[in-house]
């Protein structure tokens, strides 16, 4: 899935910011560079195809998440950390006939990688499989996180300029980054999503006025589609949906 997301990102047209958009992007980067943090975890995946023996694999992952409050509630795309969520319950066609896939993930050793290089132990607080969201929070009470303005939002409009605030990969020291682009499509069914011209998986997206629009998630093919391969496309999930789902966290 990572290679598909990277290929999609590289195929997007480049968008060079200038004038007021560049100024606002620089301002947002300074204000919210610590609102996007990496989450690390060890994930054990168990996969069973029909009556075949169960296959088990363990891997360490690092995924980007967006900070929602000062207490450290973080949201990230579920499909990037619970690697079985996109496969469980799917039916694949084989020469021997359709086979149903059963998959589950055990996510452990969850840590929030803080801007100063320290690690904070964390846990999964809620999974929203419909929206591809997972909410995480520190194991111990905290109040030192830098959240995005979850209540200061705006609707998505076609061809609106956008600003993405994120971080580079481990290989590039997880340095803060900012990118600009535009909303190239607004998808209204089966629910509202935006398609933007910049990669934003797990990252907060703002408009040119600094209003919070949402975060990038992965939109997967339906489990009832009958397709053998799990196709994924990165989309912008509106802030209102994130806030509604976050309100269920206890």
List each language-model region with its residue ranges.
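Sec-dependent signal peptide recognition
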Residues: 1-7
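Terminal peptide-recognition signature
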Residues: 39, 65, 72, 76, ...
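Catalytic-histidine neighborhood of serine endopeptidases
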Residues: 69-127
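N-terminal activation segment of mature serine protease catalytic domains
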Residues: 17-77, 109, 240-250
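Short beta->alpha transition motifs characteristic of CBS
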Residues: 62, 69, 76-84, 166, ...
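Flexible, gly/ser-rich surface segments that form the specificity/activation loops bordering the active-site cleft
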Residues: 24, 145-200, 216-228
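C-terminal subregion of chymotrypsin/trypsin-like serine protease catalytic domains
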Residues: 206-250
């Amino acid at each position: 899935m990572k290679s598909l997301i990277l290929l999609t990102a590289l195929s997007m047209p480049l968008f060079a910011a200038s004038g007021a958009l560049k100024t606002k992007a620089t301002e947002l980067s300074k204000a919210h560079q610590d609102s996007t943090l990496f989450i690390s975890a060890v994930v054990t995946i168990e996969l069973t195809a029909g009556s075949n023996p169960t296959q088990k694999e363990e891997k360490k992952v690092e995924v980007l998440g967006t900070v929602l409050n000062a207490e450290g509630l973080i949201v990230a795309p579920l499909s990037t950390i619970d690697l079985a969520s996109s496969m469980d319950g799917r039916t694949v066609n084989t020469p021997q006939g359709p086979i149903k896939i059963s998959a589950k993930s055990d996510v452990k050793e969850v840590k929030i990688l803080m801007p100063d290089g320290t690690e904070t132990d964390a846990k999964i607080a809620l999974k929203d499989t419909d929206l591809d969201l997972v909410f995480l929070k520190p194991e111990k009470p905290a109040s030192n996180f830098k959240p995005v303005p979850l209540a200061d939002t705006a609707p998505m409009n076609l061809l609106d300029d956008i600003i993405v605030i994120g971080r580079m990969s481990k290989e590039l020291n997880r340095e803060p980054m900012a990118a600009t682009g535009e909303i190239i499509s607004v998808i209204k069914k089966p629910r509202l999503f935006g398609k933007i011209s910049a990669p934003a998986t797990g990252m907060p997206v703002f408009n040119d006025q600094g209003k919070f629009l949402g975060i990038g998630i992965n939109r997967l093919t339906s489990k009832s589609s009958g397709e053998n391969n799990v196709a994924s496309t990165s989309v912008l999930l509106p802030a209102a949906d994130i806030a509604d789902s976050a309100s269920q966290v206890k």
